[in-house]
């Protein structure tokens, strides 16, 4: 099967793209609701509908990306999210404080946006490592998906980046992975003006 783009919008987005045993969802929001709790429940209800529509399973979610307007809302979202996912098969993922684009005419009250990467081939095993409420790493079809890591023990961005990368060195050794096989990275900084500090430890 090639690449399938489904429910393509006028804005140039596909609601979901299928490729190589994976489903990639565009971020979903629910600005018609006023509170974070209502928006989270509305988004997850919509994903229930979409998973049913496309024949997907919550137990096959590999990776979650959540953008939140207010960091103080994270615990409230987590309570709802962890009740919704399959507790025996939690995904890796990241939750980031960011300002989601406020879409008109859908509304200017977007408090969060949520997207998933989902496995589509039940014949391929999914391995989850260091499982608690979530998991540190998910392995599927020759790919490894890591939960986002932070290192708040030190003060500067450069020191935190170095600390995170040292932790990844340990994890790569633990799981038998190689840095030359890294396909993509995501890094999120509290202060965009400090992003230059990222370069030296990251490129080392």
Region roles according to the model:
Residues 1-166, 170-204:
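N-terminal presequence-like segments and the immediate start of the first folded domain
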């Amino acid at each position: 099967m090639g690449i399938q783009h489904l429910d393509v919008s006028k804005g140039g987005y596909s609601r979901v793209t299928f490729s190589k045993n994976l489903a990639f969802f565009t971020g979903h929001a629910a600005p018609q609701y006023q509170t974070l709790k209502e928006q989270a429940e509305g988004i997850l209800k919509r994903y229930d509908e979409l998973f049913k529509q496309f024949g997907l399973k919550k137990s096959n979610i590999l990776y979650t990306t959540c953008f939140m307007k207010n960091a103080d809302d994270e615990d409230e979202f987590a309570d709802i999210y962890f009740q919704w996912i399959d507790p025996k098969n939690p995904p890796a993922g990241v939750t980031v404080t960011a300002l989601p684009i406020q879409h008109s005419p859908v509304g200017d009250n977007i408090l969060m946006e949520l997207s998933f990467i989902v496995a589509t081939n039940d014949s391929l095993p999914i391995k989850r490592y260091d499982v608690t409420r979530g998991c540190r790493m998910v392995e599927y079809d020759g790919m490894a998906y890591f939960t986002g890591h932070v290192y708040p023990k030190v003060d500067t961005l450069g020191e935190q980046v170095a600390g995170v990368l040292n932790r990844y060195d340990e994890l790569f050794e633990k799981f038998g992975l190689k840095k030359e096989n890294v396909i993509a990275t995501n890094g999120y900084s509290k202060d965009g003006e400090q992003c230059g500090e990222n370069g030296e430890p990251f490129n080392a």
